[in-house]
Amino acid sequence: MPRTQRNDNFIDKTFTVMADIILKVVPFNKKAKEAFVYYRDGMSAQADGEYKEALDNYYEALKLEDDANDRSYILYNIGIIHGSNGEHERALEYYHEAIELNPNLPSALNNIAVIYHYQGERAKEEGREDESEALFDKAAEYWKQAIRLAPNNYIEAQNWLKVTGRSEMDVFF
């Protein structure tokens, strides 16, 4: 049974109904409609914690989707799943692909920074100070990019940049 017929959540049902109306009203081509259906089902499965099903849907959407901006969001969501599963290197690959297609995606930039920061903390705990500092510097660069795009977001990152002396831009604060 397609995921669109299994939504138990009111918000998911509402989103699905609205998406179906948009698909019927707006003149998309068949391929774009199919890609959107897979993307929508992927988001629904991801929200339900059904990561394998979500990935299957996202990969199908990627095969069909031609629009670079839409592809960036699909790649971003795939990155989220891999990150949630502790597959940080794989998540980084997808986030980097997403920002190659859409450099104005602050959430992907933030997630890259979060992974580098996490890896920096791990390196620090294991006594690899030079590696730790290099990873923290990478995290800082990605957080700065994310904050430039969304200055009212990422307050904790802004504070971390300030406290660690990695912020050259007072405009954040």
UniProtKB/Swiss-Prot annotation:
TPR repeat residue intervals: 35-68, 72-105, 120-153
Keyword Zinc: no
GO biological process, one term: photosynthesis
Gene from which the chain derives: ycf3
PANTHER family: CELLULOSE SYNTHASE OPERON PROTEIN C, TPR REPEAT-CONTAINING PROTEIN MJ0263
Protein name in the entry: Photosystem I assembly protein Ycf3
SS bond list: none
Highest taxon above the source species: Bacteria
Signal sequence, renumbered to the chain: none
Function: Essential for the assembly of the photosystem I (PSI) complex. May act as a chaperone-like factor to guide the assembly of the PSI subunits.
Family: Belongs to the Ycf3 family.
SUPFAM superfamilies: TPR-like (SSF48452)
Organism: Gloeothece citriformis (strain PCC 7424)
Compartments (UniProt record): Cellular thylakoid membrane
